[in-house]
Amino acid sequence: DNKNLIELITREVLSTFNKPSAKPQAAPSLKQGGANVLVVLTGVSNMREVFYREIEKLSGAKYDILLSDGAKAVFDKNELASKTRAANIYTSFQYSDRSEFLNKYDAVVLAFMSLSALTHISSLNTDSMVCNYLVWHMISKKPLIVSAEPLLNQIGDTRPAIMREINQKIAKLSEFGVSVVPL
């Protein structure tokens, strides 16, 4: 079907990029000055206060924030503006400006990986706008950094089959050149 065809084509494009002559750019040091970072927020509601604590770690970087539709229900734009040093907070975007928009950033950070985002990105599914941007950034071989720790902590050891599936998807992200980091 079309979904499988799109996935096969996208995998072929990624394999072309993965040739030794086209290695991904090294992730800039996000804690130092000079990095221009896009922080993407999804609707992981239980991580709201953690986000405000963790964003301070980017004190030396210039960063913007992009909110998914789910994040717009969790985060108030005015509160984000008052509690962070984000230069810009984006709540709407289009497919047509994707490349131009992403070219401004040295790295994209998905602050908290939701199960939905993990599934979309690891399968190269771009039917949500935020995941489309994340996959496109990954295809362009620029650093994509995600934190899966909250997702892993949420599932815990009680569901081994689910954890195995999640770990396989995280491993696939690593194969694609995504840096999966703890908080």
Model segments located where?
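A cross-family phosphate/adenosyl-ligand binding-site feature
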Residues: 1-128, 135-183
